[in-house]
């Protein structure tokens, strides 16, 4: 496994994977959502200005401490929603990774076309799928990235912080 959204050139990595995919083969791809992670650059900026003498682990500890203090004083201030919050390495990766690319659905659509891959659908929670279907009852809309983009713009937290989807290489 690899992490495309942490590569210097994610499309180059994705192209390599698509290149070894057999005709008719399917691939599961996970990419950070620009809308879902919109608060991350703000958080990162607050802690990037911290003194360098504490290092990255010190910044992570300070971030987690401040978050928990905020949460105790205002329970509605839940900005995490991350299972990754409580381990040092996963919190560092989620909030402070030095290389991060975030995507919007139109970029995914463009990349799929460039790589000659067809979109097979998002791997989502049942509640998200049901909500989408209420707005877009035509079953074919599940495969239309433009419809998902409309939906996400109205529901910016729909995908959490990451898109997870399937695509196929044509036969």
Q: Locations of the language-model features?
A:
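Short, solvent-exposed loop/turn segments at secondary-structure junctions
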Residues: 5, 34-36, 125-129
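Short, low-complexity, polar/charged sequence segments that are solvent-exposed and flexible
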Residues: 17, 46-50, 124
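A short SAM/SAH-binding and catalytic strip from SAM-dependent methyltransferases
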Residues: 1-11, 27, 33
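Rossmann-like AdoMet/SAM-dependent catalytic core
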Residues: 66-171
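Generic beta-strand/beta-sheet core signal
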Residues: 1, 29-32, 120-122, 168
């Amino acid at each position: 496994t690899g992490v495309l959204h942490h590569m210097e050139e994610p499309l180059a990595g994705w192209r390599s994977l698509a290149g070894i995919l057999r005709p008719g083969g399917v691939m599961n791809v996970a990419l950070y959502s620009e809308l879902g992670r919109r608060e991350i650059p703000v958080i990162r900026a607050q802690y990037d200005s911290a003194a360098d003498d504490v290092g990255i682990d010190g910044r992570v500890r300070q971030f987690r401490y401040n978050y928990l203090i905020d949460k105790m004083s205002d329970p509605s201030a839940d900005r995490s929603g991350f299972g990754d919050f409580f381990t040092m390495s996963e919190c560092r990766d989620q909030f402070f990774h030095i290389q991060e690319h975030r995507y919007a659905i139109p970029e995914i659509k463009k990349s799929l076309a460039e790589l000659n891959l067809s979109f097979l659908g998002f791997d989502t929670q049942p509640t998200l799928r049901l909500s989408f279907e209420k707005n877009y009852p035509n079953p074919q809309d599940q495969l239309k990235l433009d419809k998902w983009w409309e939906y996400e713009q109205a529901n910016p937290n729909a995908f959490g912080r990451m898109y997870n989807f399937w695509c196929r290489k044509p036969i």
